[in-house]
């Protein structure tokens, strides 16, 4: 089922411009970011922040695709309002999780975001609309079409 899509050597994809590992461990393992491996008791959680790259229609994408199971999922979102993406991985037994998080801020906290001019604030009575779409892929052809929008696996 779809709950197993992340198992058995699934791959992660993202339309992005820049990557910012959030720790020394994340920096040291950046070459492994796109691979999803079986549970490992020694695995330590790591996170990567990204600035996304929009397509011609203004959308960015992140996918988790598993060719072996011929299943996958893609999150599609507007890059003008959700211009960043956080990827969090913990592939440890009992804590086996991947977070695919379109967002408008990095995970470094409000103070650092304010310091870098990245803190998004709404004015009183202001509202903002966000667009997010979840796509489920079933079968080899749907996976091929989903993977074609990327330059390659993370």
Each PLM stretch: what is its role?
Residues 7-79:
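Active-site/ligand-binding surface loops and adjacent short beta/alpha elements
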